[in-house]
Amino acid sequence: MNGVTGRMGYRQHLVRSILAIRDDGGLLLPDGSRVQLEPLLVGRNAAKLEEIATRHGVEHWTTDLDAALADPRWDVFADFAVTSARADALRKAIAAGKAIYTEKPTAETSAEALELAQLAAEAGVPNGVVHDKLYLPGLRKLRRLVDSGFFGRILSVRGEFGYWVFEGDWQSAQRPSWNYRKQDGGGIVVDMFPHWNYVLEQLFGRVESVYARTATHIEHRTDEQGTEYPATADDAAYGVFDLAGGITAQINSSWAVRVDRDELVEFQVDGTDGSAVVGLFGCRIQPRTATPKPVWNPDLKDERDYRGQWLEVPDNEVFGNGFRAQWEDFLQDLVAGRPHPYDLLSGARGVALAEAGLRSDAEGRRVDLPELQLPTQPTPRLQADSGSDSDSAASADNADSASAASDSASASPDVPEVVQHTETVGARA
């Protein structure tokens, strides 16, 4: 586990996922048996690693990533370290035959992200990318509605995400200052568009084009040391996404907006037979048979309680931590020898959407997204099979696919590549 001294790597991936599974007796398999997990903590700060290991009863930790990758005892390489070091670490892990589980973005450019997906496919290495939003209660309820045919023909999706992030002067900011410096990898497009890509494509359809406008609404902020600095990164993005099947989605993302909704992110889905308003936890529906019939009349105050005319979807099951839920799915897929659906290719599509959004803003037009495909897609193998299958894994030149993925950025030299800094500290290759 590379990068466990940072906030997300420690809290969500180590403590609430891997250690929680370990403390429950191991990974529960469909036949009722369990597979126990043993983590190896990797990072650059030996003192922090030792403190975490002691606190949680973890036996193994190291600051030597290369030695960890060379050790055959470890089957899975999980990366939560800085994005700038991720691609090199993933390449080494793939070459070592490790299964891959990684945070987003998987690389700094879509071409590099696609290259990683191709390398993993050629090596037959199982791989997964964190798609945590799909495992949250609200979106799982939405998935049930979509699968049940509740909406009829889905027409549109509207999303609102964000909240007011204080400037850091008279009140401290609740997000780190690097988020607002483009040169440090900040910006809401590179942060949120990869999330919107997997939410849209997994629930509604592939993103075929994007029109986006970005803004830096707050031009000066104050950092953690009390020093004012120019905000060079976008703090808001307004996107329109054309999806396969004729669905139109529009999502506003902003760190300069005040919240007047039930949750920090909400999606409204409208279809011919019904609509839903979904957050991270809640889900309210209005079927066609219970839809009111408003009449526009600006001369009279409308006394209807429109929000009160929606029905709350019950939980009907116990929802656990979303990060742990995906970890369990990934590990069960790994043990069973089947591909994980949220893989490095899916991660590359998220990076490509962020690049296309930045290009759309720079050029003031809609940008089409080519469908990313790998020239070869052999069946991923288990770590235990590495010795016999590696030589026979199919190999092909992926230059054409990588070129298609990077066209959205290369056509405009002023469009920045997607670079995302994280707070997580991990070992550099």
PLM feature spans:
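N-terminal Rossmann-like dinucleotide-binding module
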Residues: M1-H56, R428-A429
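Short acidic low-complexity segments
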Residues: P30, H60-P72
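Core-facing hydrophobic residues within beta-strands of well-ordered domains
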Residues: Q36-L37, W74, I154, V207
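C-terminal glycine/acidic-rich active-site capping loop/insertion
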Residues: T222-E224, Y229-P230, Y238, D242-L243, ...
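Intrinsically disordered, low-complexity terminal tails and inter-domain linkers enriched
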Residues: A384-T424
